[in-house]
Regions:
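Sec-dependent N-terminal signal peptides
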Residues: 4-13
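Short intrinsically disordered, low-complexity segments
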Residues: 11, 36, 40-45, 133, ...
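Sec/Tat signal peptide C-region and signal peptidase I cleavage site
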Residues: 16-20
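N-terminal low-complexity, Ser/Thr- and acidic-residue-enriched intrinsically disordered segments
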Residues: 21-88
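A conserved cap/lid and substrate-binding interface adjacent to the catalytic center
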Residues: 61-181
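A short secondary-structure junction signal
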Residues: 107, 190-191
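Gly/Ala-rich beta-loop-alpha elbow adjacent to hydrolase catalytic centers
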Residues: 182-186, 190
């Protein structure tokens, strides 16, 4: 009886371990796919209409739209790509921010002083950013904060700090996944 019980326990243990390993490989493949597509998107965002990376992504079902906005401080360039995950049925959205490409961007990079950070609306974030960063509150790179504020104003939230565009879709669609990525200044914005 002990041998049968031991055999059943071993079968359960090894069967569960094999199933867990299979799931782990699937997750690893999915992570590798996300990483490869994110890297391709980081390259493609520099020449969105002509890039071979975006052509490759489009050939695999990705819909990609480039965006550019400019205000007095920042020129914001990014793309929004969307696709449906074949094996999980989840809606995937990827926002890719372009990196440093001009003097204005370098000006943003070189604003290295800290600024206070926090809040849940644009107004709160702007008010907190005007505080002294030495108040023992979270602080971020001033230039990156300026860039992210520009992105938020131009494409993420409306005047009432409600999500709009793709961010609204992600917020309202429970079975969706948002990937934020970028290179250089774009990587800072994505973070």
């Amino acid at each position: 009886m002990k041998k049968i019980l031991l055999a059943l326990l071993c079968l359960c243990f090894y069967g569960t371990a094999a199933f867990a390993a299979e799931k782990s490989i699937k997750e690893q493949l999915r992570d590798s796919y996300y990483t490869a597509i994110s890297a391709a998107s980081c390259l493609g965002v520099y020449l969105p209409e002509r890039s071979s990376e975006f052509s490759f992504m489009r050939s695999h079902g990705w819909e990609i739209a480039p965006y550019a906005f400019e205000d007095e401080d920042v020129r914001t360039n990014f793309s929004i790509a969307s696709n449906t995950c074949v094996d999980c049925g989840m809606e995937l959205y990827m926002v890719t921010f372009k990196g440093t490409t001009n003097k204005k961007d370098w000006g943003i990079n070189l604003k290295t002083s800290h600024t206070a950070y926090g809040g849940t609306t644009l107004e709160e974030m702007e008010a907190i950013a005007k505080r002294d960063p030495q108040e023992k509150k979270p602080a971020v790179h001033e230039g990156f904060n300026t860039y992210v504020d520009s992105v938020l104003r131009s494409s993420v939230v409306d005047a009432q700090s409600k999500f709009k565009g793709v961010f609204k879709k992600v917020y309202e669609t429970p079975n969706s996944h948002l990937i934020l990525t970028g290179h250089s200044l774009g990587g800072a914005a994505a973070t």
